[in-house]
Amino acid sequence: MDPERSYVYVSNINGDPDEKNGQGYLSRLTTDGRLTEQQWVTGLNAPKGMAIHDGYLYVADIDRLVKIELNTGRWVRDFTAPEALLLNDVVANGNGTLYVSDMVGNALYRLQGGEFVAWIRDDRLMHPNGLTIHDGALIVAAWGTPINADFSTAQPGSLLRIDLTTYTITEIDGGESLGNLDGLVRVDSGYVVSDWMSGTLMRIGDEGRRTVLAHWTMGLADIGGAGSTLVVPFTMDGEIRAVSVAP
């Protein structure tokens, strides 16, 4: 979501999640839900998570991070990671460093100073998916492990905190074994996460309290938003909803 320009950007895989078919694209909607450009940026493979920094949109696209100029939709450049298996979400911190999750590869990548490389590989990541940054740490919504052929897991994913100075990985209180986590945002004094497999939207408060906000069907994916209004995609239904999570 781009409050500055009053747009919502939507990634459309248009194929299998790991298929390099060049048919993926980005759509642009107004913040009141009106579709302005269905194929705003084309030629992608299977685009997923996105982040905005300094007038540019960065898009995770299987094994590359694509940089798009927001004012024009111009494709500026790619940052490639040939060893990545399924780049998923993207987040930017205040100094311009970007972090990208590789869910299938069980790794986190970092773009810093024009260099895009694997930053952390650790089994404790539990197949990282959604990302956000808060209070000097990278917060990770993990999918769980091991990943079966149908993407179910024996062990549910947790909400993790990675200190950006020490790289220490810990579980967040109340965020242990939540589910097959996908979307993640910081809202007020807690985190809102989505469970893709169960279709559950949950809030994990800083005090460690879990609250189920809504329960829908399978396919609840990445989350965007501003304030207490979230934009929630339903990937199996081809639908986007605005959801209020005001306390």
Q: Residue locations for each model-derived region?
A:
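Beta-rich, blade/repeat-based domains predominating
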Residues: M1-R5, G22-Q23, V41-Y58, P82-Y99, ...
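Beta-propeller domains
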Residues: V10-R34
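Recurrent small/Gly-Pro-centered beta-turn motifs in extracellular repeat architectures
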Residues: S11-I13, D61, D102, A142-G144, ...
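Short glycine/acidic-enriched loop and turn motifs that connect beta-strands
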Residues: N14-D18, R64, G105-N106, T145-A149, ...
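WD40 beta-propeller blade core
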Residues: S27, V66-K67, A107-Y109, L160, ...
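Short loop/turn segments that connect beta-strands within beta-propeller blades
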Residues: L29-R34, E69-R74, L111-E115, D163-Y167, ...
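A short beta-strand motif characteristic of beta-propeller blades
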Residues: R34-V41, R74-T80, E115-R121, Y167-G174, ...
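Asp-box/WD-like beta-propeller blade repeats and closely related beta-sheet repeat scaffolds
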Residues: R64-T97, S101-A107
